[in-house]
Amino acid sequence: MLPAPLRGAATLLAVLALAALLTTVRHNASAYLTGVWDTGSQTLVYGRIHQMEQGQYAPGGFLGVYTDDWSDDTNRALFRDDTPTDAAAFHPYTHQSGLQGWLFGRVNRLLRHRLPDGLARETALYWLNSTLFYAAELLVALAVWEEFGPLAAAFGFASVLLAPWLQRGMKDLYWCLWTWLLPLLAALWLCHCTRVRGKTPRGCWPLVAAACMVRCMCGFEFITTFLILCEIPLCYAAAKAYFVRRDPHGALVWLGRTVGAGVSALGGVTAA
């Protein structure tokens, strides 16, 4: 049997490979075949990517647009056609940090060396976003498998494959649906490490904070939902300790960890 670190690395590689395969086979990177939604918000990311593409900078590094109307497709066209723009025309969107704009802007600049065509780079960014979402969902499915068995994991992941909203939305460069799952994944990892080691490693608390911070830096929308997702695995562990194992003390310990995770999550939100 492989050592635990090697097993973990092999599992992660397998998850990424399967996620990439699903993105390719199900055409999630194609706006034509699987559609898009909420193009108005995505415009902010296209504006930021194009700003970085032009070598322009604005204080704060926020998302933004080069037009007064966010609802049209102009900023996307500016990016895809590599149209020269006036730096003074950029209107920053300062309601969030805009981490996704910086991330995709960096990736786009790397892609330019191999993909000079704007449409090809857009498809590559969609492919990356969708692959990360599938990878996050597969990791959740593995956690469900470990606790409830393969049938529950299969049904759960099938709901992702069959959900039109997710199939269309996972490519969206503004919403970045994979970041919605980061707080849940951090909490699941905390629970896993605690069960394996018998105590919670100190590094799990800043991991929870970092997961919430990254999500909030991509937008504060639905933050209460993400915080609830972060607490669900720990609340389940507390309930299992009390009702299944008949261990009131163990349940209290898990409730304490739930509070700790909540404090860490709020710290991440505040930092964002």
Report each predicted region and the residues it spans.
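Membrane-interface transmembrane helices that cradle and orient dolichyl/undecaprenyl
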Residues: 186-203, 237-241
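Start-transfer (signal-anchor) and selected internal transmembrane alpha helices
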Residues: 1-24
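Short hydrophobic/aromatic helix or loop-helix immediately within or flanking a transmembrane segment
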Residues: 79-123
